[in-house]
Amino acid sequence: MAFQFNFSIEEDLENKLTSLDDGTCVLKSQKGKEDKNQSTELPGLPQDRLWKCSSLGSAASSEDTDSPPSTADRSGVPEACEKQPSLKPAKEHVIPKDCDQVLENKVLEMLPGSQHVSTAVVKTISLKEKFPGENIVSQSFSSHSDLIPGVYEGGLKIWECTFDLMTYFTKAKVKFAGQKVLDLGCGSGLLGITASKGGAREVHFQDYNGLVIDEVTLPNVVANVPLQGDSNGINEPAGKRQRKSEVAQETCKCRLFSGEWAEFCKLVLSEKLFVKYDLILTSETIYNPDYYSTLHETLLRLLSRNGRVLLASKAHYFGVGGGVHLFQKFVEEKGVFETRTLEVIDEGLKRFLMEMTFKCPS
């Protein structure tokens, strides 16, 4: 699968990447099958769409069902805020002035892509060494799961719906320039990073887990900051690259938050000069029907009247019961948003790309 964008990563990033002698980042096909009941790993990823880097984990095969994906590409929140016994408080994660320190002790690798785009991401398997013992990192990798309900809602792995949406950005020539964008349940932050590279005036990243923001999203954002001097995707010579202060200035248009959706809403809406989002991007966040009410309320409160939501999802998620059709029915019953299917990917597990807009925008 090729992604074609009209921008490229900074040339100096090559100096920050750790050499991977084993050719870790390659596209591998999946072989064999595993019993669904023996693993909570996402099964049945289509062979031509799973970018299987060691940082992204592996998956077992299946035909029609799926288990919960990464929710910090998917942040889960229960149905009614007031009924939730312990809401995860929201907070903003400040980007350090010295962005180089964000990448210290991080192992970065390039995601496979076309010659027109390169994206570096943290090799998340390396985080096991930084966080030894019992914690959400070790538990996620040891259990082969990207979901520990109420504790860890994903983000250490990137699932194929994110790539589906990135591909759609190119095919549909989605315009980001001048837009205020929210990457909701961001995980790796690839959707928001793409928007930033596309000229968005401001990009916010939200994830359930603060650790995912600090150790995955933030480093990915810093590693992919576009140079203002770039022209037609060609990087300037080393001597003309932006100084650290200029890189920090470029990241100022990005803000990062952690916490549950309801708490995140409270935090940003408490700002006197808060302006709602023109575009909300979200991938694999509708796997659990228990979260639909809070997700719907979040979109209702944060989307501008003429804005739109671009959502990517599996048709159905095995084990939790959520999926596209159930979510569409929920939205229709609320009567606030119109939904439109943009694309159906019928390779392996069926996947959908959807658009949501207000029924009465003005």
UniProtKB/Swiss-Prot annotation:
Binding site for S-adenosyl-L-methionine: 158-162, 185, 206-208, 259-261, 283
Functional description taken from the UniProt entry: Protein-L-histidine N-tele-methyltransferase that specifically monomethylates RPL3, thereby regulating translation elongation. Histidine methylation of RPL3 regulates translation elongation by slowing ribosome traversal on tyrosine codons: slower elongation provides enough time for proper folding of synthesized proteins and prevents cellular aggregation of tyrosine-rich proteins.
Residue numbers of Tele-methylhistidine PTMs: 144
One Pfam family hit: PrmA
Assembly and oligomerization: Interacts with GRWD1 and members of the heat shock protein 90 and 70 families; these proteins may possibly be methylation substrates for the enzyme.
Lineage, broadest ranks: Eukaryota, Metazoa, Chordata, Craniata, Vertebrata
Key words of the record: Cytoplasm, Methylation, Methyltransferase, Nucleus, Phosphoprotein, S-adenosyl-L-methionine, Transferase
Protein's recorded name: Histidine protein methyltransferase 1 homolog
Polar residues biased stretches: 55-73
Gene label: Mettl18
Compartment list: Cytoplasm, Cytosol; Nucleus; Nucleus, Nucleolus
Domain of life from the UniProt record: Eukaryota
Gene Ontology biological process terms, A to Z: peptidyl-lysine monomethylation; regulation of ribosome biogenesis; regulation of rRNA processing; regulation of translation; regulation of translational elongation
Residues bearing the modification Phosphoserine: 62, 67
Region of interest: Disordered: 28-89
Reactions catalysed: L-histidyl-[protein] + S-adenosyl-L-methionine = N(tele)-methyl-L-histidyl-[protein] + S-adenosyl-L-homocysteine + H(+)
